[in-house]
Regions:
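Fourth transmembrane helix
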Residues: 133-169, 196
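Generic alpha-helical transmembrane segments of integral inner-membrane proteins
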Residues: 37, 41, 70, 149-156, ...
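Transmembrane alpha-helical core residues of multi-pass small-molecule transporters
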Residues: 64-67, 150, 191
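Membrane-proximal first intracellular loop
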Residues: 1-144
């Protein structure tokens, strides 16, 4: 591919690259926009229903997917070819995305973990009745404490981790450029996979419990 990333700084942006596009990029653009809009629309109704039922993690998961797909779709429409000279520099729009980039990815994984944890807790209930209003409020509070602290910290700490303002690429749009340091590794790279691993463990607990119970009954 004979294209290059256009790196934007405070002083302005480069206009050296010539306009360029090809059928592959056009197909990529169409698919990105179509599936991005479709995915966002498909999440609207579930998000409303889950929010009404007090399922905070699942509702935030849907909202996270909607926001990410809006970013992907709008970015593809704005920077749909390699005509760097005519590109919009992305001031404001890319600044917003840079601060939300890792936070949204981490929130996505945190939601998956919290959904699995809540499902495991509900499967483990031995009573027939549902949760009381007090238990639901407590569950919502715990979910909020699981979901939001790390993403909010990432948003607040982003300015200290960036090595430059941002860069822009065709179809992808805004890109974050981070400094290669241990805070970046610990507070930005590791949280999402750790949440994912914890989600797998939480999902496996009911299966493990179900496999242990028959063995205990057989022993008695």
């Amino acid at each position: 591919m004979h294209w290059q990333y256009a790196v934007f700084a405070e002083s302005g942006f480069s206009q050296e690259a010539a306009a360029y596009t090809n059928p592959g990029m056009q197909a990529n653009l169409v698919l990105r926009v179509f599936f991005g809009i479709l995915a966002a629309l498909c999440c609207l109704v579930p998000m409303k229903l889950l929010w009404r039922n007090g399922e905070l993690a699942a509702a935030i998961f849907c909202l996270d997917v909607i926001i990410l797909n809006i970013f992907y779709t709008v970015n593809a429409l704005i920077w749909q070819d390699e005509n760097v000279g005519n590109w919009w520099p992305g001031y404001g729009w890319c600044d917003l995305q840079v601060y939300l980039d890792y936070a949204l990815d981490t929130l996505y994984s945190a939601c998956v973990f919290e959904i699995m944890r809540n499902l495991a807790a509900k499967v483990a209930l031995s009573r027939v009745t549902g949760l009381t209003s007090g238990e639901k409020r407590r569950q919502t509070l715990i979910s909020a404490l699981v979901l939001f602290p790390i993403p909010l910290f990432q948003v607040a700490f982003t300015w200290f981790i960036l090595s430059q303002r941002y860069s822009v690429a065709p179809l992808i749009g805004c890109l974050s450029i981070y400094d290669s340091s241990w805070p970046y590794l610990v507070f930005y790279v590791l949280p999402a996979p750790l949440y994912t691993i914890a989600g797998v463990i939480a999902a496996g607990k009911p299966l493990l419990a179900a496999s242990i119970r028959p063995n205990e009954k057989n022993r008695t």
